[in-house]
C-alpha cells in the first residue's frame, strides 16, 4: 500500500483564505503533498488558476476540485465538484434535494466541513 499525503479542506484568496491558489499549490508541493483539494467557500473560481499553477511549476501534485457550500444546515464539503451548483432554488429546510443535486453535479465525497462547530439546527452559516 502506498501512502499519499493529502490535504482535503483548503481555502484560497478566492474566498476567505490567506494564500493565493498559486501560493497554496507551492506550499502543498513544498510540504510533499500528493493531493490538494481546493474547497473555497461557495466558489470554484480558483480551480483553473490552481491547475495552471501546478502545471506551469511542474509540481507532482494532483488537484482535487471541490467547494465548501454554506447552507442552513452548515458548511458542507463537496469534493469532486468542478462547478458550484445553483442551490438558490432549493428548500433550505430539506437537505435531501441538496445532496441529490451535489451527486448529480459530480460530487464524489460529501461531508461536514466543521463537525465540532455545532449550532442550531446543525450549524449556522458563515463565522469568519
What are these regions, as identified by a protein language model?
Residues 1-109, 113, 119-128:
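A metal-dependent hydrolase metal-coordination microenvironment
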Amino acid at each position: 500500500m502506498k501512502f499519499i499525503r493529502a490535504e482535503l479542506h483548503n481555502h484560497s484568496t478566492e474566498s476567505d483564505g490567506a494564500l493565493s491558489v498559486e501560493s497554496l499549490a507551492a506550499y502543498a508541493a513544498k510540504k510533499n503533498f500528493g493531493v490538494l483539494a481546493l474547497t473555497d467557500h461557495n466558489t470554484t473560481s480558483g480551480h483553473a488558476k490552481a491547475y495552471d499553477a501546478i502545471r506551469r511549476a511542474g509540481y507532482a501534485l494532483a488537484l482535487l476540485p471541490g467547494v465548501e457550500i454554506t447552507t442552513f444546515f452548515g458548511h458542507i464539503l463537496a469534493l469532486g465538484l468542478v462547478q458550484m451548483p445553483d442551490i438558490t432554488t432549493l428548500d433550505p429546510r430539506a437537505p435531501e434535494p441538496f445532496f441529490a443535486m451535489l451527486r448529480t453535479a459530480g460530487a464524489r465525497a460529501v461531508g461536514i466541513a466543521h463537525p465540532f462547530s455545532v449550532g442550531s439546527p446543525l450549524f449556522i452559516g458563515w463565522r469568519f
